[in-house]
Design a protein with these regions (language model features):
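Bacterial N-terminal signal peptides that target proteins for export
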Residues: 18-29
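Gly/Gly-Pro-rich "capping" loops immediately C-terminal to redox-active cysteine motifs
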Residues: 68-128
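Short, cysteine/histidine-rich loop/knuckle motifs that typically chelate Zn2+
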Residues: 63
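Flexible coil segments in periplasmic/lumen-exposed cytochrome c-class electron-transfer proteins
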Residues: 43-45, 49, 57-59, 67, ...
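Ala/Thr-enriched low-complexity intrinsically disordered regions
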Residues: 7-15, 25, 36
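Bacterial N-terminal signal peptides
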Residues: 28-38
Length: 186
């Protein structure tokens, strides 16, 4: 019975009028709540697994540090990346290195505001002079993503010793030919 009246109202006003109805407002609030709950439940339950995906895919750390984080990156990389497997860095130190890079080395920073203030090692870009950090990569990371990478490195990489065939096959699949060069896990 209200359809002719609604059809006569211009679309913009009709949208505002519909949106302002208390029932519709409640529906919109419920939809927003469901979307929030869905987004939160989509957060990874295993931060190390999420960190591994970020390490290899989004941040592309493996390009320089290698798939096994042993410093054996891609041939086209700058070379000389740290062997993270031998690192002694603590979680907060790993986070700072990933966020801020390492001035004077090819290690980039993943914080888009790095060195604009003193958040990184207590210095600004101007204070670094010739030791300016490498240009930031095209991808920056959120703090939670950097934390997930650090969690992955601490759980699955740091202190693990030499790369094993099992680690290689976990990465490339059982029986991968390239994994034959690595020893079995002791």
């Amino acid at each position: 019975e209200h359809l002719p009246i609604i059809a006569a109202i211009p679309a913009a006003r009709r949208t505002m009028q519909i949106m302002s109805h208390p029932r519709d407002t409640a529906l919109i609030a419920a939809a927003a709540l469901i979307a929030t709950i869905t987004a939160l439940s989509a957060q990874p339950s295993d931060p190390a697994s999420y960190g591994r995906r970020l390490y290899h895919d989004k941040a592309q750390c493996s390009y320089c540090h290698g798939w096994a984080a042993d410093g054996a990156g891609e041939p086209q990389s700058n070379g000389g990346a740290a062997n993270i497997r031998q690192s002694f860095l603590k979680r907060d130190q790993l986070i700072e290195v990933i966020m801020c890079g390492r001035p004077g080395t090819p290690m980039p920073h993943y914080d888009d505001l790095a060195y604009t203030d003193k958040r990184c090692y207590g210095v600004t870009e101007a204070e670094l002079g010739a030791q300016r950090p490498s240009p930031p990569p095209s991808t920056t990371l959120q703090k939670r993503e950097v934390e997930a990478i650090a969690d992955y490195l601490l759980a699955k990489v740091i202190g693990r010793g030499a790369v094993t065939r099992e680690e290689c096959e976990e990465m490339f699949g059982p029986g991968a030919r390239s994994c034959g060069q690595y020893p079995n896990k002791q």
